[in-house]
Amino acid sequence: TAPPDASKMGDWGVFPWLYNTDDATFAFLDDVLNEVMDIFPSTFIHIGGDEAIKDQWKASPKIQAKIKELELKDEHALQSWFIQRVGKTLEERGRRLIGWDEILEGGLAPNATVMSWRGIDGAIAAAKQGHDTVLSPHPVLYFDNRQSASAEEPTGRGHISSLKDVYAF
């Protein structure tokens, strides 16, 4: 069960709220990630990092002061700093961070792997910087999408991703 301030909102999508950059935030994330790593032996831990709307950070005097304190260029650089901080927790346990291609914006953690959902450009950019990449472009490689229009097809989201489409990629 999630604590009330971290409970599910009842819907999914892109939301404008980003994590605070306080030490308490990282303590919470460290606890969650350590529990995940205790349960799952995978070398890679996917932390997301996509669709992080920066409006809340731009409007926050506290966050702007943090950007200045850390001598960062902008909110993208702050997201990079944030993700690198999370990556340190993973590295301490011998794990590797993997995140969506938006983590390229602002700079990557040294051992980060990029999972490129917006096409091949993010994968190419990450590879040119010496990072491992995984191609997972939307919609063709989203395997939670429906695979046919058949009435027997289980409910899925978004477009139909047929076997032919996947193999053609």
Predicted regions and their residues:
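Aromatic- and acidic-residue-enriched carbohydrate-binding clefts of CAZyme catalytic domains
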Residues: T1-A24, D55-H76
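Substrate-binding groove of N-acetylhexosamine-processing glycoside hydrolases
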Residues: D22-F44, E51, A65-F169
